[in-house]
Each structure stands twice: as structure tokens, then as C-alpha cells.
From Swiss-Prot:
GO terms for molecular function: calcium ion binding. The keyword Repeat applies. Potential calcium-dependent cell-adhesion protein. May be involved in the establishment and maintenance of specific neuronal connections in the brain. Residues 922-932 have a biased composition (Basic residues). This is Protocadherin gamma-A8. Residues 714-932 are cytoplasmic. It is a single-pass type I membrane protein.
Amino acid sequence: MAAPQSRPRRGELILLCALLGTLWEIGRGQIRYSVPEETDKGSFVGNISKDLGLDPRKLAKHGVRIVSRGRTQLFALNPRSGSLITAGRIDREELCAQSPRCLININTLVEDKGKLFGVEIEIIDINDNNPKFQVEDLEVKINEIAVPGARYPLPEAVDPDVGVNSLQSYQLSPNHHFSLDVQTGDNGAINPELVLERALDREEEAAHHLVLTASDGGKPPRSSTVRIHVTVLDTNDNAPVFPHPIYRVKVLENMPPGTRLLTVTASDPDEGINGKVAYKFRKINEKQTPLFQLNENTGEISIAKSLDYEECSFYEMEIQAEDVGALLGRTKLLISVEDVNDNRPEVIITSLFSPVLENSLPGTVIAFLSVHDQDSGKNGQVVCYTRDNLPFKLEKSIGNYYRLVTRKYLDRENVSIYNITVMASDLGTPPLSTETQIALHVADINDNPPTFPHASYSAYILENNLRGASIFSLTAHDPDSQENAQVTYSVTEDTLQGAPLSSYISINSDTGVLYALQSFDYEQIRDLQLLVTASDSGDPPLSSNMSLSLFVLDQNDNAPEILYPALPTDGSTGVELAPRSAERGYLVTKVVAVDRDSGQNAWLSYRLLKASEPGLFSVGLHTGEVRTARALLDRDALKQSLVVAVQDHGQPPLSATVTLTVAVADSIPEVLTELGSLKPSVDPNDSSLTLYLVVAVAAISCVFLAFVAVLLGLRLRRWHKSRLLQDSGGRLVGVPASHFVGVEEVQAFLQTYSQEVSLTADSRKSHLIFPQPNYADMLISQEGCEKNDSLLTSVDFHEYKNEADHGQQAPPNTDWRFSQAQRPGTSGSQNGDDTGTWPNNQFDTEMLQAMILASASEAADGSSTLGGGAGTMGLSARYGPQFTLQHVPDYRQNVYIPGSNATLTNAAGKRDGKAPAGGNGNKKKSGKKEKK
């Protein structure tokens, strides 16, 4: 019972000593522990968290872990208690063999501090191995002539334990002839020898049986036995003898197998068979047996297997020479293995912190490396460095450890993965090196906004597009990765024509494709300005803007619109008047059209599709002016029908047509007379209605002439000013601008003289419109003349049958305004497609007004005529406010004055010195009327 109680106390004493030793070593700067071998897994070794000054509960947070160079992890860290424990069963003999002290060095890594702490653990031997003989039965041959005191070596027992637990003693079973003597060698080994105490007599006893016991000093002690059979031989009194008791050999570790080391020779003075010697290894362990080979006949020793200095650098063995008489001779062989640089340095990545943020500070630890070379001396000295010009460097840590740190800031957009080559080279000759690749990933941060290739774009879309049609595709590039590079697109909200921009355009937030939500109309919207924003999904998100100009392209989707002549509302066709005295190139009327399209789609051309009298009229290709292609003849019909087409230049082209009816007559009464001379159908209702219309027209004409006479009387005091202008030959003297009104008022004045004869080509209805003149207030801006409202009287005429229904020509649409190029051209005195121009300065305006005043004043002269000659105010077609002075209707030559056989002629004819052409024509026609 005493032995079991003493063992726990001794264990406690050992742990106490180990703890005191640990504290002492900590004070010296290194942590040391000790632990007995063969302890169970998880056995306590030491409180490393306390020794490092760390809180056991925060070990995981600090990243504390055990690192060691060996492949087998012997120790582990208890994360709860912070204690160093065994990771498994530890066999001291396997780790350190026969070394007096078994020390295991490990390292403790504190990752958050980037530090390594060395820990030295001593494995304490326990008596867990029995002394063991290599054989269980041993045969010893002794010659009978052996003298007392002769010694015979016995096999040694091997105990892997050390200290007191190792082999301590041998015991021999009791007998009368032999005793046991134990010798202690230079290395501390004990060698048993069998000593002959009494002379042998083979004839008395030929064999002896002994038992040899080997015991260690453990508690309790362990032992093993071997049986010894002693055979007494006949006389052979000389044993083999080696010339040297010890042989020493040095050999390089890279010597190939079969290399001869040396040859040993033992001499035996006996003759014959008793002098023949056989050689063999006597003391050799299991590891040495396959490495060396001994020729038993010659004594030659050679290498049987490649040597390795790193495994074992020194070998000790005994060579035994034995003759046939069982006489033995012994010698020792000591082999020293010399190191050669045959091992490359080994680099082990202990810890790698990947990925690393691209904004990490310089000096950030990337990895811990362990470098080791199994060679010795300079062959085992290693230098470590990195290849290429990379932003990393190696720093020396404790022992053979290095840490890889950054030298500067990283940029993932330039390099996202670094292949770091770590070179480890020894100092041997020649030096050996090792390359180790470390793949380091750089983690992205959101440091780049999305960017467009261009700051602005222009896109085009045809009008009348389909809803949902794709317009344009935008792409922004973000050099970041993952969510930092996920780009979303948006359009900044705005208003367009009072509506939100999002009702016209939408953008796919993922692809950046723009879509049209509405069908665009070029005539309403011609361009849109968009601000597109590209944002990434980082935290915080980054964005950039780009301006997009979206232009709507015109299509030929609008046909030309005819503004003049305006289409009547009753279905009738307006009648344009042309005097029979008109020469070639006389401007009859002008077709005015516009196209709401633009560009080529709005270029208009005019052409004559159909005419009742081919070759009589022509239409200007670009102006739309209807002119006489030749002089009018008496044989030409009174009513001419023209169909004019207006066509744009789109693809395909669109067109519109208008039908014009031209009445060929020198005066309005002549028109009425000739219209009345047509044979209408007999209808009593139509005849009475025609009579009423004729009377109404005559009455209105009289009132109009009376109003003109009164107006001319009021303007008589300015007559001398007008005559001065005429006598100067067309050159105007300075007339104050304040006496005249602008161009728009001149147009209004011209409108007061508008006369429209609407003759329906396809019906028997027509009506003649006489506007009441109101030019007094139009021309005088400073005089207090009374302003008269214009009176418009409409009279219908029946051509063939009297019908109850009648219509009135609608005036032109006043909503439209003409540009300078769209205004009607000059009078019939001009030829071709030339267009007239509006007065563009004050002098031209005053001159125009003076001519109007002069013409009006000449009407008061009874001897003067108002015939429509060239350059006079001849009768033109449908005069609106857009016509120039040359289109003012010459109402004087078309009005018959009762009680006088003279007709009013244009005073301009007198000034020009020309005979009034229109006057002669009127006289002839008057004669015809008298005959009728």
C-alpha cells in the first residue's frame, strides 16, 4: 500500500518542480513546461494564457493558436481555460530516442498582435519499457582448456528509457563454474560478461544452462531474461585478434550504395580449421542493420543503403571475429557521416491572411512563414526574400519565422490577385533554393464611381415610333467588383410640355436601355434633354451623370395644306378673274401651301394637273404662281378650270390638289353680262332671284362710288403733294413718316378693295362679293377722319337653272402667317416664277403709300380713266392681306358709271405715257353690250 501512495506524491512534486521551472523560464523571456510521457489526451501542460497575460475568454478574439514545424501536432490549446494540453499520447522514446533530455519547441501565435512566443516543453521519461534482449536463446561455446578467469561477452539488453528507468543491472542464475561481471563503457553503457570461475571438463559436463536477467531502476522495476546454453568444446587455445581495438571512418552522406568503407582483418595463430575466421556484426541496432554490409569471409564493410546525415550522423558498431573453435575477437567501428548540401530549404506558410483590403495600411501583416533546412552548418543557413517588384516585403520574426507585410497601399483595380514568389536559399556550395507561391487576393472597396465613355451622347429616333421601342443603350463601367460594380441607371425627373419626363422616356435600371413610352411627333417635340445617372451598389454608393440629347427625326406624315385659295364651306369653287387684255406672264393668282413637316419633307413643288384650256396657264414649280402662258384671246372661254397639285419631297411623297376657276373678263359688269348671257334652264323662281341680285349689285356699286368720291374730296388738300411726287418722275421728296402707316396697315387697305367672284364650276350658283372701302382711316394716321367699318355684300347669280340653295365663300384661315418666301408674288406685269417682295424699310413703305394716294386722287378726275394696263392696279384673284400693292384690284375699270359713256382709267397710264390697253377693250365690249 505504501508504493501506491508515494506515486501521487511524487507526481505532485514533479508538477510543482515543473511549475517553478516554468515561472523561472518566463522570467528569463521564454516559456518552459514539462509533461510526463504517455499521458492521456487532453492532459494539462501549462496555463499559457496566464503566462502570456491574456484573458482565457478572449483567446479566440486574439487569434491565439499553436504552430509547430512538425507534421504531427503534439499539443493543443484549450479555448475555454487557456491551458496548453496534450493533443494525443506522447512517446518520448519515439521522439527523442536515447537523448538525455527530450525538449519539444513549439510557438504560440497571437494573430491580432502579429507576435510569436516560443514555448519549450520537456517530455519527462517514465518507466514504460522493459529491457529487451535481441535473442531469447544464446549459445556460448567454451573450450575445455579455458583457464579460470576467462571472459565471454554476453548480449546486452536494450531499454529505450533513460535515467533511472533505463537498464541498471544484470543477474546470472547461480552455478558453480561461471560468474557475471558487468563493465561500464565510455558512453555509460553496461556490458555483461560471463566469467569462468572453475576449469571445465567436457567429459564431466559437456553443457551448462544459465539464465541472464536484465533489470532497470524504475518503480516498479522492469526486467527481461535470456537463456544461455554453454557448450564445452574441444581444445582450441587461440582466439582471433584484431590489430586495432577501434576503427574510425568518415563518409559523405551522398555516397552511393556499394561504396566500400574499409576492410577489417583478425588473425588466428591456430592452424587448419581452427585458424579460419568468420566476421559478423555483434552490436548493431535495427536501424543500422540495413545500412551497412559486412563480408563474413573477407571482413569488407560497404554501404548497403543511402545514408542521410539529417537522420543520423554517427554510427557505432562492434565487429566480431570467430574461429571454428568458437574463439572470439572483437573491435569497434565508428562511422561519422559528413553533411553535404543535398536538402533544399523548406518554406511552410504558417498563416495567410487573404483576402486583404485594398486600403490596408502599409505594414499590414499578410502571412507568417516558417523556413527550415535539414542540412547543417552553412548548408542549413537560409536567406529568404521575395521576387519581382511587388508591394510586399519579408521581415524577420523570431527563430526561423518570417512575416510578409505590405510596403504601400494596394489597388485592386490595377491588380486583384498577387502571385507572390518567396525564395528561400541556403548558403551551401552550390546553394539550393526553393520557390513558394502565395496567391493573395485583394478585397475591393467602393472607391470608383461608374463612368460613361463620353460625357454626352446624341440619339435619334424617327417620329411615329412604336410605344416601348428601344431608343438607345447606355453602358457605364465601374472598375470595382461584386456589388461595388453593380451599376443601376436612372433618368433625372423633369417636365416636358407640362408633363413629367417619365411619361415620355423610361430606362431599364439594369441594362441602361432607353425606351420610348409614347409615340413622338416631330411637329410637337423635336428634341429632349436627358440627364442619366449611373450609380453603383456600394456603401456608400457612388454615381456619375451623363447628358443625352434625344432628337426626333421628321417623317413625311403630313400632306401639304393649301392655305390659299381657301376651300369654301358650301362645296363651291372660288373664281379668279383675269382681264382679256392680260399679256403672257400675267399673274392670275398664287396657290399658297404649307407643310408641317421639315427639311426635304417640307419642300413643296406645284404643277398643273389639268386645265380646261391646255397651254393657256402655267404654274410656278416652286412659287405656286398661276400665270398666263400666252396672251388671252377673244375666243378663249369665259370660264377656265384648273387643277393644281402641291407635292412635297418626302419618301413617299404626299400631295394635295386644289381646283381653280378663272373667269376671263375685263370688268365685273362684263363678267356679269357674259354669265347672264348663258342660257339657263327655264325656272321662274331663278329668274326673279337673278333680277333681285342684279339690282342689289347695282345699288351697292353706286354706294361704293359715292363713298370713293367723298373720300377723294377729303383728300383734295393733299393733292399738290401727290402731284409733286408724280412730276419728280417717280422720285419721292421727303414726306414725313408720321403721315403714313406701316406695311400691315397697307395690307389692311388693300383688303378693303378685295373683290371675290365665286363662280361654282359644277353648279349654277355663283356670288359676287363687293367689300365696302374703308381706306380713309388706314392711310391717314394723324388726321381725324371718321372710321367706317367695311361692309361685305354677297349677291348670288344662277347660271342655268334657278335653285333655292346658295353658298358663300369662306375667308382664308387667319390663324396662319406666311414667311417672306410664302407670300404671293408680284402682279401680272412680271413673268416666270419670280416672287414679289414686301417693303423692307421706311422709304419703300412711304413710296408705296404715296403711290396709293396718287392713284386714289386721280380717280376724282372725270377725264381720267382707270383701265387696267400693264403695271396698273389690274384685277387680280382673291386678294387677301398677304398680297402686295401690285395686286390691288383695279375696281375703276370694272364699274360702269350710269349717265356716262366713259370708263375710269388708271392714272398710271398717263404717267407712263402709254395708252390704256384695258380701256380699248372695254369700249369694244361696251359696243357689244349696246348691240345686245
